[in-house]
Amino acid sequence: MAGSYGETFDGKILDDLSGAWVEKHNWSDILRRLTKIKFALQADRDMIPGIVEDLSTEIPVDENTRFPSGKVYHLLTKEMLMAIEAIHAASSFKRRAEEKNNVNPRQRFEAESSSSQLPSGGLVVRPAAGSGDSSLGEDLFSNSKLDDASTAFHKSLATLKGSRPKAVVQRTFEKEYSLRWTAAAPVAAAGGTPPGGRSWTWNLV
């Protein structure tokens, strides 16, 4: 229904509308999908940015648009926004070895074979320990970083699931910000009968 909040749409409401408002079902869906993530799997980590992008943080309200009837919204706190950012950041982790050796198993086998030499005596001579990168060292470093990223992800997700953002509906929203919605006056069609009025016919002699 057309109308306006008029002069009541001022003050604190203007500041709060710039915050992150999330519709209840959208919020529940995001939490459900994040909960299903198996962080140890790269394929699952790659899904996280898309999930976060599906979070809609705008509320369709302005001076001439009333808070949606029948909808429930949450205003996310600073702590919740930081947790979401931490989850997004953690998803960018990739194992160093996977990035460096982004080749198929056959290529990796051939590369490892070429690092060995077989002299006439049949003795295999391998590169001295410490010459070049250490695969074991890289794996340990990578696993340590994965643990850090996994901890950040699960801790932040626990923060979001444990939060209890206030549920806001049309009535509580308008009460909170002292808003008064005034419906626009109906416009009578030309030559028609105004709502609630009478139709008069004048006979001119």
From Swiss-Prot:
Q: What is its main location?
A: virion
User: Where is it located?
Assistant: Virion
- Ranges where the record places region Disordered: 98-130
A single GO molecular-function term is: structural molecule activity
* Superkingdom classification of source: Viruses
Spell out where the chain crosses the membrane: none
Which Pfam family, any one of them, does this sequence belong to? TMV_coat
The record ties this protein, via SUPFAM superfamilies, to:
TMV-like viral coat proteins
Q: Where is the composition biased (Basic and acidic residues)?
A: 98-111
InterPro entries, per the entry: TMV-like_coat, TMV-like_coat_sf
Keywords of this entry: Capsid protein, Virion
Q: Name one GO cellular component term.
A: viral capsid
Q: Kindly provide the name given to this protein in its UniProt entry.
A: Coat protein
To which species is this protein native?
A: Tobacco rattle virus (strain TCM)
